[in-house]
Amino acid sequence: MAAAKPTLTDSLSFCLAQLAAAAGEALGGEKDPATNETPLSRALLALRTRHIKAAGGIERFRARGGLRPLLALLRRAAAAGSAPSQAGPGSAPSSAASGASSPAPASGPAPSAVSSSSPTPPVRLRKTLDLALSILADCCTEGACRTEVRRLGGILPLVTILQCMKTDSIQNRTARALGNLAMEPESCGDIHCAGAVPLLVESLTACQDSQCLQSVVRALRNLADSPQHRLALAQQGAVRPLAELLATAPDAALTLALVRALLELSRGCSRACAEQLSLGGGLGPLVSLASHPKRAVREGTILILANLCAQGLIRPALGNAGGVEVLVDELRQRRDPNGASPTSQQPLVRAVCLLCREAINRARLRDAGGLDLLMGLLRDPRASAWHPRIVAALVGFLYDTGALGRLQALGLVPLLAGQLCGEAGEEEEEGREAASWDFPEERTPERAQGGSFRSLRSWLISEGYATGPDDISPDWSPEQCPPEPMEPASPAPTPTSLRAPRTQRTPGRSPAAAIEEPWGREGPALLLLSRFSQAPDPSGALVTGPALYGLLTYVTGAPGPPSPRALRILSRLTCNPACLEAFVRSYGAALLRAWLVLGVAPDDWPAPRARPTLHSRHRELGERLLQNLTVQAESPFGVGALTHLLLSGSPEDRVACALTLPFICRKPSLWRRLLLEQGGLRLLLAALTRPAPHPLFLFFAADSLSCLQDLVSPTVSPAVPQAVPMDLDSPSPCLYEPLLGPAPVPAPDLHFLLDSGLQLPAQRAASATASPFFRALLSGSFAEAQMDLVPLRGLSPGAAWPVLHHLHGCRGCGAALGPVPPPGQPLLGSEAEEALEAAGRFLLPGLEEELEEAVGRIHLGPQGGPESVGEVFRLGRPRLAAHCARWTLGSEQCPRKRGLALVGLVEAAGEEAGPLTEALLAVVMGIELGARVPA
């Protein structure tokens, strides 16, 4: 087949020349339109179908200067279309449907490319415009062309054509070109300024062609590129026709275009947008489209519904249309493991939370399972950024008893307590228009003011009681404005005050304007917790470890004065008799004392953590709360509850009761009966070596035993008993030292041979007198009685040194201190342990006591610490065990050291709890070790 014969229109230069020639013709020229019509049409057709469609064709067209004549041609057409109707040859008035008249000028007949002589543009003119607008729209798909069109002033002619040429095809291509130009922010602003929006809105209602409607809708969507432009579109009525079209969209393509446009217009939904969409009847179709089979339509519709929730005025209607169920179901699907990413859930979470602001929607959300969904989000650490918003939304259910019961059953209270502990950010502020529509704003005219009020106001201003008319309200009266409490003008801040800062109220203001309590990040969580605490028996939810931990973390960790609501919650719980047993079972009373009174928080144990503290404030609060519990415990109900708990409770409850009693019982008859007569103290001591039921159990136990010791014996016991006085600063004279010199006096008649080969001099008579063991060894029938060099097996020089001193009558000379290692070094396996064993083997009880006293002075004295207590206890000496117990429970030790010492004692005791129990029991009861202890 022969190749197609080349034509003139195959040349871009020829086409551009024809375009330039047509653009340069004057409207009143004498050229016959027929001489240029066919070449121009052929050139435009070739440009659109071949040159522009080719690879790089748009850029070549722009580089060769094709945009300037193309815009000139459109500008001439726009000018002709907007010219006033005049009588003249070849001219006729345009029809009303065209919306404008375009007669030829009086100077002569106009070229057919720009004239109108019929109710619609002439066929040749319409064809020329269709081709030119199509070329321009294609060119505007590239950024460089959009920039040049804007520079050449091509936007205004397009707006004029949109106004004058009401043919669907021309409207379609013009809207398409404007939509492409609107992709540039600068061009978008120029299109708005040129007044294109009302014309596009008019096209929505007048046009019947689906393609044209899609182009107009797309142009409006692209024009909504900023909040200001979206608001302008809504205020110019662009939303309502879109909503009306949504219900009657003839095909899926137009439906998708409408959904995409409404999605863009509803971003940051304005009041005008919501009102127009509601008036246009768009809510029902939107809810229906949420189940559309096409994913793009379905997801776009759901996002539109989510955006609309930002306006309170439309949320009730949205709920009536079924939007609540749609949004809840969609969020539930996206929450599934195989659902969408967390980022895609954010607008839905925000929408569901906003729906909680109206009572009617809260009921729908509750029935749709929204409470379970919100609780799942609260439990999800990946959704932590949304937690403040969700908690604030749940405040809407504050007086919904059924919903509160469901939320409590789902575990809301521990999650709220976690909110008080966390570092979650502030809840995102919503606009004023997102407020609940249960209480819509009403603009009522001001009431007419009576003459008596005007006279009173005039007199108050003249006398200086008011500075202006606004200072006095017609609603004010002495009965409505209670007097302010008498307080100094500048009260001095007291460190023990726990009140939140208050703001003075102006007497002339209405009582409704009273300043409420501070509302910070923790406000919603505290409000919900306060509501739960007002139940008849809130113990199951609030008197638990997590709940108390969260409240106390907030109270002690707040940078400023904590919210009074948190203090009221704690006070309300401690004053409620129904909560007494829960405070005992959960170690809540012990936690209040440890955290608030003693300043030891769970995360400060066992290693302290640096934190800013206001201990005096917290101590006052803790003592007040414990006093509340004391009142409950010493009431007839409390006595019965504690007695039942101690005698008939589970083993864990009995131990918790025994531990808590010294903190909340001050009546001697009560604590003596429960702890001493009915075995509560022994229960507590026996539990020390069992697995701890609470992270701070041993700290609590040390504090409890110390408090009980103070109750039993108000006088303070010395930390180190004075069984054998030993003044280390001025030791007694040494009686053994003369035997060690070069000329000993008296001369030794005996030497002891150690395993190391060292020979130690001794006096036979003194050694036999000091110990029954050596008396039998050296004066009896043993072979050693005839020997001058007596071996002492299993004894090192350091351990033998205090033995030799003691045999020769040294008491308090300091020799007993020699084998004792300094604090921080182990005693087991040391020469001190060896010396103690030797003293027992050689029947030297005085030496044993002296060595034990030396160990106590070094390891349990001022230089020793709680870590030494366990080391001393490991020696297994009853007197040293008593030393350790007295050191641990001594009132001069800080609570932290007491707790750490008890931890060391329990570790040292291991499974053999008997010696530790007896030592602690004897110290608490004030009984010397070895005496009879009451059963």
Curated annotation (Swiss-Prot):
Ranges: ARM repeats: 143-183, 185-225, 227-267, 271-310, 312-357, 359-403, 405-444
KW Glycosyltransferase (keyword) present: no
Metabolic or biological pathway: Protein modification; protein ubiquitination
Biased amino acid composition, Low complexity: 82-118
Segments of this protein annotated with the region Disordered: 82-122, 424-451, 467-515
Entry comment on modification after translation: Ubiquitinated by a BCR (BTB-CUL3-RBX1) E3 ubiquitin ligase complex, leading to its degradation. Deubiquitinated by USP7.
Principal place of residence: nucleus
Gene Ontology process terms (BP): adrenal cortex development; anatomical structure morphogenesis; CD4-positive, alpha-beta T cell differentiation; defense response to virus; in utero embryonic development; mesoderm formation; proteasome-mediated ubiquitin-dependent protein catabolic process; regulation of steroid biosynthetic process
Record's keyword terms, sorted: Chromosome, Cushing syndrome, Cytoplasm, Disease variant, Nucleus, Phosphoprotein, Repeat, Ubl conjugation, Ubl conjugation pathway
Residues annotated as domain BTB: 748-816
Effect of R898W: In AIMAH2; loss of function in promoting apoptosis; reduced ability to promote degradation of SREBF1; does not affect interaction with CUL3
Cellular location(s): Nucleus; Chromosome; Cytoplasm
Consequence recorded when altering G323D: In AIMAH2; uncertain significance
Positions with biased composition (Basic and acidic residues): 432-446
Record text on subunit structure and interactions: Substrate-recognition component of the BCR(ARMC5) E3 ubiquitin ligase complex, at least composed of CUL3, ARMC5 and RBX1.
Recorded disease: ACTH-independent macronodular adrenal hyperplasia 2: A form of macronodular adrenal hyperplasia characterized by multiple, bilateral, non-pigmented, benign, adrenocortical nodules. It results in excessive production of cortisol leading to ACTH-independent Cushing syndrome. Clinical manifestations of Cushing syndrome include facial and truncal obesity, abdominal striae, muscular weakness, osteoporosis, arterial hypertension, diabetes.
UniProt-recorded name of the protein: Armadillo repeat-containing protein 5
Organism listed in the record: Homo sapiens
Upper taxonomic lineage: Eukaryota, Metazoa, Chordata, Craniata, Vertebrata
